[in-house]
């Protein structure tokens, strides 16, 4: 999978997209067949997949956290399953946020592990077994929708309303991971994140296919005002411009920005440059929670950068407060029906 999306993926299709179309056609055929024909294993406990149609971020991790919090409010014991992208460990691992580093397990699993039991595993089937053995009542899988390894009891596809599905073309012409028709066949519902219009075409297509569409937005959890504060905003996430927009919405004055690739591990020079530029100019450093967890205390000046940076925390809030509960109920009902079918066929 492509790790960094080129900018032309997110604009109207141009000659570059069309020049790569033959490769996209082949990629789409393979990806679509894999989704439709692969033999999928079943989980011993209900499994919700939080996925997206495209390469890059769409808000899956904060959405997964919102669903987990709703599950805990219902007295369930949710757990997260992640591939651990960006981490070096290639064995099934129960993530310990006090012990593991982003280099070990990836940045997103560290955020998830602060909320609930989290396992990373290259083979998601093994990860699901591990979580069931650990006593999870419901598994929330962050990403992995196109992997075709597990049966989903509910597949919620997150679409960023500001980006939609980009130019609508398949990798490598565009950001789409598999033909939308194939993906919709395996989706249970869509979540439109935000109130922009870029996602509307795919949302309408999903509605015509009979898929429920939920709406939510990311909201800031403010810990003190940034109004009028001059800042240097830095981030290494899939959509840094979206983060910079969020910073502006706090009332902060962005004097400088620094963008890094998603899941980027910062070098000593990069860390020093951020600290020194902000200090010399009197700017406040601001970043994301996902970036902070990639800074390793005791590793050069990383701890200093973490201490000097204000984190803009966000969470996902559904327009319908009952929506997360409905998703959980549907997943539990689907799992019961699945187990009944398995019992009858066994």
UniProtKB/Swiss-Prot annotation:
Pfam families recorded: LpxK
Keyword Plastid: no
Pathway membership, UniProt: Glycolipid biosynthesis; lipid IV(A) biosynthesis; lipid IV(A) from (3R)-3-hydroxytetradecanoyl-[acyl-carrier-protein] and UDP-N-acetyl-alpha-D-glucosamine: step 6/6
Keyword terms: ATP-binding, Kinase, Lipid A biosynthesis, Lipid biosynthesis, Lipid metabolism, Nucleotide-binding, Transferase
Superkingdom classification of source: Bacteria
Gene Ontology biological process terms in this record: lipid A biosynthetic process; lipopolysaccharide core region biosynthetic process
EC number assigned by the record: 2.7.1.130
Positions contributing to ATP binding: 54-61
Reactions listed under catalytic activity: a lipid A disaccharide + ATP = a lipid IVA + ADP + H(+)
InterPro entries listed in its UniProt record: LpxK (IPR003758), P-loop_NTPase (IPR027417)
GO cellular component: plasma membrane
GO molecular function, one term: tetraacyldisaccharide 4'-kinase activity
PANTHER family: TETRAACYLDISACCHARIDE 4'-KINASE, TETRAACYLDISACCHARIDE 4'-KINASE, MITOCHONDRIAL-RELATED
Family as reported in the entry's similarity comment: Belongs to the LpxK family.
Function in brief: Transfers the gamma-phosphate of ATP to the 4'-position of a tetraacyldisaccharide 1-phosphate intermediate (termed DS-1-P) to form tetraacyldisaccharide 1,4'-bis-phosphate (lipid IVA).
Protein name (database record): Tetraacyldisaccharide 4'-kinase
Organism expressing this protein natively: Sinorhizobium medicae (strain WSM419) (Ensifer medicae)
Encoding gene (name): lpxK
